[in-house]
Swiss-Prot record:
One of its GO terms (molecular function) is 6,7-dimethyl-8-ribityllumazine synthase activity. This is 6,7-dimethyl-8-ribityllumazine synthase. 5-amino-6-(D-ribitylamino)uracil binds at residues 22, 56-58, 80-82, 113. The active site is at residue 88. GO terms for biological process: riboflavin biosynthetic process. Catalyzes the formation of 6,7-dimethyl-8-ribityllumazine by condensation of 5-amino-6-(D-ribitylamino)uracil with 3,4-dihydroxy-2-butanone 4-phosphate. This is the penultimate step in the biosynthesis of riboflavin. GO terms for cellular component: cytosol; riboflavin synthase complex. Keywords: Riboflavin biosynthesis, Transferase. Forms an icosahedral capsid composed of 60 subunits, arranged as a dodecamer of pentamers. InterPro entries: LS (IPR034964), LS/RS (IPR002180), LS/RS_sf (IPR036467). The keyword NAD does not apply. Its EC number is 2.5.1.78. Belongs to the DMRL synthase family.
Length: 154
């Protein structure tokens, strides 16, 4: 039996990050966490590209474009969608998740879902570097691991 696992060594990896500007006080913290995680695991700063988009709904298109360019070993998506009083939240969350998955499957490049989908602003803050850790950091580690496991199949 063969077992394949990625490792957390980022040396030589090229990573793209797509960040939503909407709720930037949260997404900027997710980005800081992701950048810290990438650099601490060996990804060089000059091998990281960051693209800002207006909101979470716009993330999948840019993530797909980055992935299809084949310039990146993985793409990380970062955003924060917080439930409001209307059904808009459900539509945005569903489409961003589907679009992110489609970008990965159609390109063959790992596209990591680092978009917070929370009921409250407090939950988003907790996941952007306080009580619940930083989901940007976690997305960065997932990107490194997935990029490395994909290399085993090249």
């Amino acid at each position: 039996m063969n077992v394949y696992e990625g490792n957390l060594v980022g040396t030589g990896l090229k990573i793209g990050i797509v960040v939503a500007r909407f709720n930037e006080f949260i997404t900027s913290k997710l980005l800081s966490g992701a950048l810290d995680g990438l650099k601490r695991h060996g990804v060089e700063e000059q091998h990281i590209d960051v693209a800002w988009v207006p909101g979470a709904f716009e993330i999948p298109l840019v993530a797909k474009k980055m992935a299809e360019s084949k310039k990146y070993d993985a793409v990380i998506t970062l955003g924060a969608v917080i439930r409001g009083a209307t059904s808009h939240y459900d539509y945005v969350c569903n489409e961003v998740a589907k679009g992110t998955s489609h970008a990965a499957l159609s390109s063959g490049v790992p596209v990591i879902f680092g978009v917070l989908t929370t009921d409250t602003i407090e939950q988003a803050i907790e996941r952007a570097g306080t009580k619940a850790g930083n989901k940007g950091w976690e997305a960065a580690l997932s990107a490194i691991e997935m990029a490395n496991v994909m290399r085993t199949f090249s």
